[in-house]
């Protein structure tokens, strides 16, 4: 493995001003790809930016077993404001720009009032595994896919284990901290014996610049890729450090998720999401540990929290 120490670094403020914008070639000086082999990349400030492992999953039965399941997922989210720009054609809902610099809108309800919930452009992106308390769901829980599609979930778990092994081999200190953190969470909310609680599945979505909110601060993110068909773009850039990765099929990237990062636009040949019909697809799978899951109780106690929440909502509607 080759070590790279970058010689340029921008300010955090300048990187944050790019949030929601998509990456362009002007944003990077160094571009990593499969031809260059494995790379460990440090910033000019001495921090570890990423470790790039091209082809690390090629020929791995766990990768081959998980792909059909993840390809077949029809997860859709409108809670990805950082994915708004460049993906508006996924669904035109009359989005408007909000002061945060992200594309958000509020729907008009049937009674004519405006919803208080902000939404973004719908994209093929979603979460599987487990999730902590948040917003309207103040209880820890399995995602719907993990709870209902148990056989398919079982086909994904070996890939999570394989990626956990690559994390331990390549970022040992961070992997140890993250594994200890996850082991302290009830078993019901861990992805088997891996150092992860959650996976985000992005299907052919070009994320605008963003930091990953909610990931364990002392941990690391792990991303892997499945490419099918012909397309251009999808280069992942860390603009503060002016380095980018053009990842290919079976590649793995270990990265600091708290750095602002984002992708260049995607342009493919043939129907999107349908490589079996001569089209194209770019699956990126991101695994991490959710920091707020340290609060999770055993499932019975979390179900009690969920029931109390349901009763509160029912009472509120009854008095409305």
Tell where the protein language model's regions lie, with residue ranges.
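Conserved metal-binding segment of the jelly-roll/cupin
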Residues: 224, 245-260
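Ordered, helix-dominated protein-protein interaction surfaces in large eukaryotic regulatory proteins
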Residues: 226, 238, 252-255, 265, ...
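A short beta-strand-loop-beta hairpin characteristic of the jelly-roll/cupin
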Residues: 226-248
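Short Gly/Pro-enriched loop/turn and capping motifs at secondary-structure junctions
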Residues: 231, 260-262, 291-294
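Composition- and surface-driven signal marking solvent-exposed, interaction-prone regions
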Residues: 234-239, 265-268, 299-301
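Histidine-centered metal-chelating micro-motifs
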Residues: 253, 258-274
């Amino acid at each position: 493995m080759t070590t790279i120490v970058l010689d340029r670094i921008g300010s955090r403020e300048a990187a944050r001003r790019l949030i929601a914008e998509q990456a362009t070639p002007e944003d990077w000086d160094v571009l990593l790809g499969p031809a260059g082999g494995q790379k460990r990349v440090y910033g000019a400030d001495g921090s570890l930016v990423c470790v790039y492992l091209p082809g690390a999953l090629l020929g791995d039965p766990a990768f081959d077993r998980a792909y059909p399941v993840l390809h077949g997922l029809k997860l859709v989210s409108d809670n990805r404001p950082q994915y708004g720009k460049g993906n508006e054609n996924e669904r035109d809902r009359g989005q408007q720009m909000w002061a945060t610099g992200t594309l958000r809108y509020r729907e008009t309800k049937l009674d004519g009032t405006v919803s208080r919930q902000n939404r973004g452009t719908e994209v093929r992106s979603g979460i599987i595994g487990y999730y902590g308390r948040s917003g309207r769901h103040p209880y820890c829980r399995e995602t719907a896919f993990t709870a209902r599609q148990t056989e398919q979930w079982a086909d994904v778990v070996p890939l999570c284990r394989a990626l956990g092994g690559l994390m331990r081999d390549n970022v040992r200190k961070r992997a140890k901290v993250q594994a200890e953190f996850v082991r302290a969470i009830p078993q019901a909310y861990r992805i088997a014996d891996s150092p992860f609680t959650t996976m985000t599945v992005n299907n052919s979505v070009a994320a605008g610049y963003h930091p990953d909110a909610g990931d364990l601060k002392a941990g690391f993110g792990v991303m892997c890729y499945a490419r099918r068909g012909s397309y251009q773009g999808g280069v992942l850039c860390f603009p503060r450090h002016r380095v980018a990765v053009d990842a290919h099929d079976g590649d793995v990237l270990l990265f600091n998720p708290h750095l602002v990062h984002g992708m260049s636009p995607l342009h493919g040949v043939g129907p999107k999401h349908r490589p079996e019909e001569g089209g194209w697809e770019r699956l990126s799978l991101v695994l991490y540990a959710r920091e707020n899951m340290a609060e999770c109780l055993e499932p019975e106690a979390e179900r009690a929290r969920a029931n109390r929440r349901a009763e509160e909502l029912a009472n509120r509607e009854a008095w409305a």
